Amino acid sequence: YLAGALGEGVSGKYDQNPLYRFDYFDCETYVDTVMALVLAKNLTDFRSKINQIRYKQANVNFTQRNHFPSADWIPNNKKNGFIRELTYFIAGQKTKVSRAQINRRSWYHYLTADRIQIAYLTPQEKESRLTQLKSEGETLYFSKKVSIAYIPVFELLRNPKLRQKIPSGSLIFFVGHDTYLTSRIGTPMNVLHMGFAIWNKGQLYCRMASSKAKRVLDVRFQDYLKTYLPLGTLDGISVWAIQA
């Protein structure tokens, strides 16, 4: 596991972590990589696909990266034709909608020097580059109202037939709210985590890159949902299919 495992490569202005890799992931870059492998016909196509998945219109630039799942990643990849929503199909009238105001300008303002992933820069040079990034981001972006449909946690825990409708290999977005996270990054988020639904021997698992376990692992789906119950931060899940 490595937070922010991918960047814009050696020509990146702010983040020169590789455009793709297979040794380290965070939750999003794991999904990015697996999805690109599913969609690609060969290595050249993989390189193209991962840029299409990670950046708006495949424009490899920090400010064009799909930083926010509900504001960027999902709508841009839906537009690409790479994903299709299953949430309503699975849950029907049990489906709820989460809304949030993503404050991009504030998010850029809260960025710290560790976002500048260029090994040869001195600490002072990183601070200077961070100032450039904040200025660029704050000029480009304003707040955006976003919404995402989800299946409530309590419905998933009490209704095994509902869980059985989730196809193996589906994308799972964990929808919720976290005031502590908001205070750290400068904006509310209504998608807290992402991974894949995997069926194995009649059991449903979530396959994900875990910051706690520091690796990619399978966690029994119900057990993972229950870990959020004492925190009260998880509302439910949004389910999407990869359109290979």
Regions found by a protein language model. Give the residues of each.
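Acidic/His-rich structured neighborhood in mature extracellular/periplasmic domains
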Residues: 2-151, 167, 176-178, 191, ...
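Short, flexible coil/linker segments at or flanking structured domains
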Residues: 10, 56, 160-162, 185, ...
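Generic hydrophobic, helix-prone segments enriched in Leu/Val/Ile
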Residues: 50, 73, 156-157, 166, ...
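Short amphipathic alpha-helical surface micro-motifs
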Residues: 50-51, 153-157, 178, 218-222
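Short alpha-helix capping/helix-loop boundary micro-motifs
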Residues: 148-163, 182-184
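C-terminal soluble interaction/assembly domains
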Residues: 172-244
